[in-house]
Amino acid sequence: MNKYKNIKRRKSNRIYVGNVPIGDGAPISVQSMTNTQTTNIEETIKQIIKLKKVGVDIVRISVPTLEAAESFKIIKLNVDVPLIADIHFDYRLAIKSIKYGADCLRINPGNIGNKRRILDIVNCAKDKNIPIRIGVNAGSLENDLLKKYKSPIPEALVESAIRHIEYLDSLNFNQFKVSVKTSDVFSAIEANEILAKKTVQPIHIGITESGALRNGIVKSSIGITSLLLSGIGDTLRISLAADPVEEVKVGYDILKTLGIRFRGVNFIACPTCSRQEFNVIDVVNQLEKNLEDLSTPMNVSIIGCIVNGIGEAKVSTLGIVGGSKTSALYKDGIRQKNKLKNQEIIKELEIKIRKKAKSLDKLKKII
């Protein structure tokens, strides 16, 4: 797999969310957020388990009430993924969440309250040695900044962030990351570019409230890719009005495409035409679903005919080239003697992919 060699990541400090390193050259972590009712403990745990299956590094959970904080405590005891408590308005819920085992807090400068409340949160975070995210959002900017700038322009978002960065610095607290988010792609890019020049703390990136699945993927891909290519971003979330599992998949797909971080199978598949000898779309979609749990990076080409099939197969870990009734199989660029029956491609190729993953994992351990 080729790596985009011209990406030079911005230098930043290192913090840890649970056992996940963030900043200072650490792998860019992929986050998501539960969309269940936090008080529905069983469903929230189930969703976190699903997120872990597709490789989530960190999960954020909304804690809007004391009952939700009590639920957070139980959830934390039943999952092994680092959890961020998402806090708005009531600083006491932040303190409760820290005491109940949160690995990190997200606080919103626009609604968390005065410096005294933030001081209490920071003192508690220091005591438990956990980080905080200063999460600035265009939809909840401080009133004085809205009055000054008339609207949540990039400069307003950054001023909010810097205001709180300076306060945390004055408290000798450096275990924090920062985010400046807006639903407008270009405003988000500009705000992060300005912020990156003004702080050495890790930056969390994302396009907030980006929309439903298709539109949200497009917006997030454009915004996040632009920032990553500039070396900005130490952790990310794809915000979608969709199943949170999709957020994680898209996050990894972006990192994979840029050659920054690899997880699981990278499928190369043709868009299909009348030349296809088997149903490429069905095969790819089913294999993607079946292999969600696989973390071993590899390229698998699934091409419906010989036009581009052979060329793609020769540069793939495994490759299928469509033929009449049976299709050619390539392994590490070499055509194999045995062919796969077109009606059994999904089953047989999944077996071969999993077998190859085991051999690659074993080789990696030996090396």
UniProtKB/Swiss-Prot annotation:
[4Fe-4S] cluster binds at residues 270, 273, 305, 312. It is an enzyme of class 1 (oxidoreductase). Belongs to the IspG family. InterPro entries: Dihydropteroate_synth-like_sf (IPR011005), IspG_bac (IPR016425), IspG_bac-typ (IPR004588), NO2/SO3_Rdtase_4Fe4S_sf (IPR045854). The gene is ispG. Keywords: 4Fe-4S, Iron, Iron-sulfur, Isoprene biosynthesis, Metal-binding, Oxidoreductase. One of its GO terms (molecular function) is 4-hydroxy-3-methylbut-2-en-1-yl diphosphate synthase activity (ferredoxin). GO terms for biological process: isopentenyl diphosphate biosynthetic process, methylerythritol 4-phosphate pathway; terpenoid biosynthetic process. Binds 1 [4Fe-4S] cluster. Converts 2C-methyl-D-erythritol 2,4-cyclodiphosphate (ME-2,4cPP) into 1-hydroxy-2-methyl-2-(E)-butenyl 4-diphosphate. This is 4-hydroxy-3-methylbut-2-en-1-yl diphosphate synthase (flavodoxin). Its cofactor is [4Fe-4S] cluster. Its EC number is 1.17.7.3. It comes from Buchnera aphidicola subsp. Schizaphis graminum (strain Sg). Pfam families: GcpE. Pathway: Isoprenoid biosynthesis; isopentenyl diphosphate biosynthesis via DXP pathway; isopentenyl diphosphate from 1-deoxy-D-xylulose 5-phosphate: step 5/6. It catalyses: (2E)-4-hydroxy-3-methylbut-2-enyl diphosphate + oxidized [flavodoxin] + H2O + 2 H(+) = 2-C-methyl-D-erythritol 2,4-cyclic diphosphate + reduced [flavodoxin]. The lineage of its organism: Bacteria, Pseudomonadati, Pseudomonadota, Gammaproteobacteria, Enterobacterales.
